[in-house]
Amino acid sequence: MKVLNPGERSVLVQYVQLALNRAGYDIRKDGILGENTCRALQQFLRKKSGEEFNCKIDDVVWGKLFPYLKGYTMHEIKSGDTLWGIAANYDTSVSAIMTANPTVNPLALRTGSILAIPFSFSLVAEDVAYTSYLNDWILEGLTVRYPFLVQGNIGKSAMGKEIPYLRIGTGEREVFYSGAYHANEWITTPVLLKFAEEYAHAFAAGRMQIGRAHV
């Protein structure tokens, strides 16, 4: 990822601010790496690892922000862990953890095993600009949160970017939704991603019967 320095203005700074918002810091997503954003980031890093910070966002700092952009983190099971305790520690739900880890027996957790832990916030942001970076992070997060989603690519754009798809279901009749296919016109991207997120969430919660459908 690009290194960001104090005073920088870019959509990537918006993503830093989005991650900090999700981590509990009330700052504006104005795309400016200014004093308020730096202060929030200092507090975030100090809480996470006790590190001091000079407001230069490098790969190490990005790595600490990524869970809040992808919507999940990984947890190594320790002796005495329970799903209920893990869920409380990460402020999420047991059902969300079970959806992301469908093969796990909640009554027989294996010490040393790794769990994907979805955070409780909605993954698809509605108040930031979209780029291929954010699109990729969201797709990764959705497929971790809802492993019954299948992700692939149908080719590459004129700019050399992969064109991804999500699929759900295995039925004979297919319904295909597409968008964001004219150069840098991204406005339909969050619409489709939000639709996919809400659809997958409803299916995981048993609120709809889609048994033989493609999305």
Predicted regions and their residues:
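M14 metallocarboxypeptidase catalytic domain recognition
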Residues: 35, 59-214
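Short solvent-exposed coil/turn linkers within tandem alpha-helical repeat scaffolds
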Residues: 27, 31, 51-56, 103-107
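Short, basic alpha-helical nucleic acid-contact segments in DNA-binding proteins
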Residues: 44-51, 67-71
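Short, solvent-exposed alpha-helical surface patches in non-cytosolic proteins
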Residues: 35-46
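Acidic, Ser/Thr/Pro/Gly-enriched interdomain connector segments
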Residues: 1-31, 36, 68, 75-78
